[in-house]
């Protein structure tokens, strides 16, 4: 069936900010979908609030709205753009929920817009657990025993029948938000309350426990002619009970019998037909009881998902692109497979390799959170590895994780035998992020495959391979010396995924010596293609992975090449922003005539799409893996400054091994990162930094802190995302920090800085070329005061309170620093301003996480310009010598995962905790801030009671805010100290007890829904601890809270702006003065 002619203009909804459960994979799928629609001549309008995405670049969609993903904003866009269709399947749960709301409120009908990709009926049937259950019963597909509840009482009566443990799954939520596993009545009540609150329809499913069953997923694609294909089967190594996003997964499924696979396949076809997904991809999850083979369906997603991104990367089959074209009316047999160019898209991919995905967690950022993995997703990123066998792919995946582990090393265990056994058995029984290493340790301690299976419920097939790897490591150790190791033994170890570093650890040699020995014996990897067809047809896209076999499938070309090192797994502190920079580098260098070679191991990203670069190596970002690629490809050089800390960490050894590093030299990077060299640099240029010192032992730390005076900021050297960074208020806190957070040593010193009270922090990004010319990209003023990590702080561009003179002085200082360091490419400087004094906090001669934001706001593609400077172009040649000028305001706001981690304090500090960001664009600061809050999911109130409690220093500043709130009709609720102060200024307010003063107190009022906004500032360890429950309950009850006066001031301005005017929506292209397709007309 050829393409429909009635689809000419489509609104695509993106997924908004990166959150746990909905991450970078939707930038990948959205970018693919937009390209596919444009290729077909369709006009594309995009709504997405996330500026760090490639899809929101102004050249992708015809009209790009970086606006809150809300019904109000979407309706205004529909009214002005008048698209004929809406594609909701590329933006995760956020897009589906918005499309559902627009349809049910009659807004789509009002503007004559149809849903494509998935009908409202299909969305409801798949997402509403009650309708899904009825649909499954109709076609005779079994589900776990379950029932629905819209109240706690209904849930309690259901569990009487279902029994414990019980699984709670809220409807229409993301990544299992609000759900969990309850083992008793108390846990059940707590999880049900949070599930009912999390579900937009206030419905939960209470389900019998299928804990310990095997879990599988099928990626299914269907077209309007009812052709259905299975793109990929995925098996979870972790059994049921762990969210699939938190499980180690393997593709294709390894332990299904052919009969079981056919049953599952037939069920999938019946399900996708009954639900009614006609055009596009769905992900269907199944559980199988290993004891009797009983199969049940768990759930389905009627959209592109995290798993479909993984399946696309695992198979080379671009699900999102195909789904977008199917939504236009094509059938599978009419579409070509890009990789082979010969086969139609209706051919199911065949794999002659194994893919392993391992999730990446960030529990170290939330030390008080429970690390147990359940049905509510907690991982922030993932890695994927490809090998010819499961052991090879598994070992490659584990070393891709960047956890400091290079293989199956022993985890820490108590020395005492009984205690050791108890800890080990618990680590096998309870799923936590470190379980893979405990499984290996169990075999070292003499446990059998049956013992480990009984405790962990991991399938014996996987356990036997892990046991084999442990035995192999032990027998390698017995050789004792490299020259005693037979070539065939070394070759087999490499074929099983043992890295040079792991072999070196086992034999007592540095990795370089193992590598030299291996090369001398001519043991090197070959590279195979991911080709969708197990090498049956020729593949045209070089999408490659390494393995230790004979035949090489993709010899390098003789073109000039640049190697780009990606950023590995997403984690807090190293997010999508760095992938964005790598993608831009690939685009720019390809346009400049270079062959681009990308190395990365993250399946969620645009950088690992098969057509982003000329050659893609899906490999771990380790010295060994990168050197093997570079020695084969022989690039003119490598770009390491775009992928965050991951490539920077390995840049010096790569340079030593003969790989030229493009742009800023590794030595200059070290001058900026090494505290003592940095202090000398600041002194040489006559600049200032906060008083500081370096401690190489506990005793030194106390001396330095005493000299500087408390409070101080403490942190380890060479970190990203403020890892283990803390504000310390007294000797006792420093003692605890030194004991628990870091181990200070000559190699790993601890940095101690004076804490700058009441200072304003500023980020500045620039590009420099080889001649010393500099272009300032933008200056961002933080809304929170100094002391909050720059990745967490809200910020405005241009600055909102700094004098032009101060801004010019900062620019001059940044240019002097760039020239002194010899920066070629990007550089970021963080300043703190106290009064009229400018302090330099840090200099990062690399891409920073603010680059995409500044590039979006100004229309200047900084990463592209920087990449071209790194291969020798000058800013003058590129025609960008002036700082970009613009008349609008952009506000960056961060998004946090606190709701997923019970008991974690939401107060911000020097350690980064946000997972993503949003942007507010408007012509004034108040409206831009209001948009940023709405985009971040903050519900700004129109009326009601505002709670104010501030530290003494902030009392004068809060008077004006209190007056403005009163004049808007809000009433004030305050603590006694603030009440006394406001009374002297003639401001009326009601007094409420502090948490420490008895009940009913402020927390009771928040829980009872009486408070609509919280302004609560604190300083000092005790005050912060005392007010913890105010912040936590505000978060859990969706009450906006502001913990600094600056943020409260912006919020009050935003409330005034919302009172006076409707927020307008405007495409990015209009803000930037870029010509886009004319709006409003259907052509």
From Swiss-Prot:
Keyword Amino-acid biosynthesis: yes
Stretch list, region Carbamoyl phosphate synthetic domain: 555-937
Residue span, ATP-grasp domain: 133-328, 679-871
Gene3D superfamilies attached to this UniProt entry: 3.40.50.20, ATP-grasp fold, A domain, ATP-grasp fold, B domain, Carbamoyl-phosphate synthetase, large subunit oligomerisation domain, Methylglyoxal synthase-like domain
Domain MGS-like: 938-1078
E.C. code: 6.3.4.16, 6.3.5.5
Annotated spans, Allosteric domain: 938-1083
Annotated Mg(2+) 1 binding sites: 285, 299
Main enzyme class: ligase
Ranges for region Carboxyphosphate synthetic domain: 1-402
Binding site residues for Mg(2+) 2: 299, 301
UniProt binding sites for ATP 1: 129, 169, 175-176, 208, 210, 215, 241-243, 285, 299
Positions annotated to bind Mn(2+) 4: 842, 844
Function: Large subunit of the glutamine-dependent carbamoyl phosphate synthetase (CPSase). CPSase catalyzes the formation of carbamoyl phosphate from the ammonia moiety of glutamine, carbonate, and phosphate donated by ATP, constituting the first step of 2 biosynthetic pathways, one leading to arginine and/or urea and the other to pyrimidine nucleotides.
Quaternary context: Composed of two chains; the small (or glutamine) chain promotes the hydrolysis of glutamine to ammonia, which is used by the large (or ammonia) chain to synthesize carbamoyl phosphate. Tetramer of heterodimers (alpha,beta)4.
NCBIfam families: CPSaseII_lrg, PRK05294.1, PRK12815.1
Protein name: Carbamoyl phosphate synthase large chain
